[in-house]
């Protein structure tokens, strides 16, 4: 009998082993869809991004006009831009849900996969930040100024680092040029990291909602999960297209319709919605260096997740106390997101500080304690 090409060809064999004949736990739920959705988001963003880059000019005098030109004069330019801008929002929705799934079901115990995932998150955040600066509107300019300025909080070398990043003494043409370079480069870096992420995942195989070894009950990825993923794609593209076609500017800042002006500061400088929770951490500490450390810690704490796991059970499926904490953490992050969008005044300052404190308390103290307590409860 002739050998099956997809199983013998050196390249097709790799695709076959990771997308077609991949042994997959039969009981993985819809929460396992977000990985493939992130892949689709990345592909969409790279394609729309390439088309936008073809019409973009990375120069402070022309950037704003070139984006306006793309929307007005380029065939379907408005659609490409709207898909790219709102696609970023969906990218973040998917990655946050993907991370939430990982925390809930103990997927972080696959340490290499988890760590590459956290690095992917940080790279994605950097990409989104530099991308937001490119249209060169008011919020683009002031967002870049405020966030890059945070590096000046680093003792001794901070100011030098900031001026080196700016390529001058303020955010100007060199800054825009290098941000465009980075925004073009980073998605391809994300692609490479994604391959590493998947390589580590396929070493161990997927986790499942019960958190138990599922080797005795695996089914091929195709057709079962390829079909389930296709449903996921449709359910994501529907709201994305709805948003991009009906209210493309819903999630944007009206301030960005004004070209960047270094002489006029907007009344409220705030990032896109998907960074508001991090902005909440930053603002809840009155000291500059303290705020920067809180912001960094809020992300880097994810690296500690495997070390803070004290339960004998992997997932939270049968751990009601941990579930309660998990959903409290989720609500807490939503509160931080809301606070981040509000002006710095009473009562938002104290709410932000309490929410920040709660976030770290839950992750560093309450999760491990609850895990240990539930272990004890198993004995009775």
Curated annotation (Swiss-Prot):
Ligand binding (heme b b562): 84, 183
A molecular-function term among this protein's GO annotations: ubiquinol-cytochrome-c reductase activity
Keyword set, alphabetical order: Electron transport, Heme, Iron, Membrane, Metal-binding, Mitochondrion, Mitochondrion inner membrane, Respiratory chain, Transmembrane, Transmembrane helix, Transport, Ubiquinone
Cofactor(s) required, per the database record: heme b
Xref: SUPFAM superfamilies: a domain/subunit of cytochrome bc1 complex (Ubiquinol-cytochrome c reductase), Transmembrane di-heme cytochromes
Record membrane topology: Multi-pass membrane protein
InterPro entries linked: Cyt_b/b6_C, Cyt_b/b6_C_sf, Cyt_b/b6_N, Cytb/b6-like_sf, Cytochrome_b, Cytochrome_b_C_euk/bac, Cytochrome_b_N_euk/bac, Di-haem_cyt_TM
Domain of life according to the entry: Eukaryota
This protein's record includes keyword Mitochondrion: yes
GO terms classed as biological process: mitochondrial electron transport, ubiquinol to cytochrome c
Protein task: Component of the ubiquinol-cytochrome c reductase complex (complex III or cytochrome b-c1 complex) that is part of the mitochondrial respiratory chain. The b-c1 complex mediates electron transfer from ubiquinol to cytochrome c. Contributes to the generation of a proton gradient across the mitochondrial membrane that is then used for ATP synthesis.
Annotated family: Belongs to the cytochrome b family.
Protein name: Cytochrome b
Origin species: Balearica regulorum
Protein's gene: MT-CYB
């Amino acid at each position: 009998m002739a050998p099956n090409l997809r199983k013998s060809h050196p390249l097709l064999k790799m695709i076959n082993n990771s997308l077609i004949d991949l042994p997959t736990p039969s009981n993985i739920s819809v929460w396992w869809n977000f990985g493939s959705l992130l892949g689709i988001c990345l592909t969409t963003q790279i394609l729309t991004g390439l088309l936008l880059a073809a019409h973009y000019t990375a120069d402070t005098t022309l950037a704003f006009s070139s984006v306006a030109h793309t929307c007005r004069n380029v065939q379907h330019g408005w659609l490409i831009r709207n898909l790219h801008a709102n696609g970023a929002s969906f990218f973040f929705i998917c990655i946050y849900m993907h991370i939430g799934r990982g925390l809930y079901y103990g997927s972080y115990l696959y340490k290499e996969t988890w760590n590459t995932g956290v690095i992917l998150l940080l790279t994605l955040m950097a990409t989104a930040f530099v991308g937001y600066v490119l249209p060169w509107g008011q919020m683009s300019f002031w967002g870049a100024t405020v966030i890059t300025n945070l590096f000046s909080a680093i003792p001794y070398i901070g100011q030098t680092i900031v001026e080196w990043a700016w390529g001058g003494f303020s955010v100007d043409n060199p800054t825009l040029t290098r941000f465009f370079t980075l925004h073009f480069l980073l998605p391809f870096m994300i692609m490479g990291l994604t391959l590493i992420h998947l390589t580590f995942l396929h070493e161990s195989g997927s986790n499942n909602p019960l958190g138990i070894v599922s080797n005795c009950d695996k089914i091929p990825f195709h057709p079962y999960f390829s079909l389930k993923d296709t449903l996921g794609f449709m359910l994501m593209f529907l709201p994305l297209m709805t948003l991009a076609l009906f209210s493309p500017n819903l999630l944007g800042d009206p301030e960005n319709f004004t070209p960047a002006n270094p002489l006029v500061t907007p009344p409220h400088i705030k990032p896109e919605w998907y960074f508001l929770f991090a902005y909440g951490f930053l603002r809840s500490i009155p000291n500059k260096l303290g705020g920067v450390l809180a912001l960094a810690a809020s992300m880097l704490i994810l690296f500690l997740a495997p070390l803070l796991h004290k339960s004998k059970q992997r997932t939270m499926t049968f751990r009601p106390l941990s579930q309660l904490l998990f959903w409290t953490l989720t609500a807490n992050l939503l509160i931080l997101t809301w606070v981040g969008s509000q002006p710095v005044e009473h009562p938002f300052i104290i709410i932000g500080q309490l929410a920040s404190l709660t976030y770290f308390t839950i992750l560093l103290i309450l999760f491990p304690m609850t895990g240990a307590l539930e272990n004890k409860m198993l004995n009775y």
